[in-house]
Amino acid sequence: MCTVIQGFGPFGDFPVNPSELLVRSLAERGDPDLRTEVLPVSLGRTAAEVPRLMEKYRPRVWLGVGLAAGRTALSLEAVAVNLAGWPEAQADADGVSVTRRPVAPGGPAAHLTTLPAGPILQAWREAGIPGYLSQTAGSYLCNFSFYTAAQAASALGLPCLVGFLHVPLLPELVTDPARQPSMAMALQAAGLDCVLEACRAASPAGPGGVYR
């Protein structure tokens, strides 16, 4: 069973999305067990592609990666909520804005991550990489893709590790260093490697599909 790493392309004021760079750098390794996908920041295409890719690959691990401008560290998302909404000023790549609506009508209120959060956080601490467990993935496409992936894995009955990692801005994207925190690409990549290693070491799913 493979590992899928899904990032996003540019959006809004960010002509470069570090999640895309991270995912493409993983693709260059030529790991036969790794599948990398970069999606546009698009509601419609994310809604269509995430379930399609989940069914196509039927992975053991699904990790989404996205940019969270303003955050000071890597943030492993604890939960995806069944809520999508963003204003016209933050319209997606197709010009779509959303007034509060469910990600999946009739779906559960939330999906908890099944990534091994404890080992990931410990690996970050040991490597000196700033990171924490976040309690909100927002209500934009990052949360949308996280929830959609978890919902798709559940519908397919897959004992799949599903989760999402938010990364800060890259230093070269910062226009006001005093107000905009950032993290170097090398440190982000090292943090992502910690996540992947912890997932590979996780034991098979226990009751409820949660990996130990």
Indicate residue ranges for each PLM-predicted region.
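N-terminal catalytic or cofactor-binding beta/alpha core of small enzyme domains
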Residues: 1-139, 150-157, 180-212
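A short pocket-lining beta-strand/turn micro-motif at the edge of beta-sheets
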Residues: 159-163
